[in-house]
Amino acid sequence: TEPLWRFWQSCGFELVRIGSKPEASSGCYTAMAILPLSEQGEALRHAAHKHLARDWPWLRQRIELALAIPGDDGDTSLGEEDWRELAGFAFAHRPLEASLGALQRLLLASNLPLPALRGHLQRRQSPAACAEQAGVSGQKALLRHWRHETAQALEQLNAQHCRYWRDWAQSLQ
């Protein structure tokens, strides 16, 4: 909740992650906040907050909280952190919700149609509508389809880089 976040913020914590769906038991969004106690902690806080700020334009469309997350520099190009997240989504088991910002930046970078991904993320179609449009049945089949479209876009953008990150993701399984 916003009052709970204000409390932690007044204690010096900085928000670095927030879930995209409220928890069923509490109705609150999951969140992670950091209070750095060392130079390394400050570096971690800075990097994590920058990542959240970069993803916030897309996350706030799904989160019903009026939070100000400053620090987005407007850069929508794909960086190495995005490639790692996208490889985790396309070639491993990273959830779509945990990859929203990177997926949105991928859609901006790719000129492929990617109808299921664009339908859900850019046109805000329901998963059921995306599955019907893609000709697949069920949430698991749709997720496989989204992963496939993501892999296609990565391959199209940079085949060598895609192979590197695919191999990296598969080495972790």
What is the meaning of each model-derived region?
Residues 1-173:
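Terminal substrate-recognition subdomain of acyl/acetyltransferases
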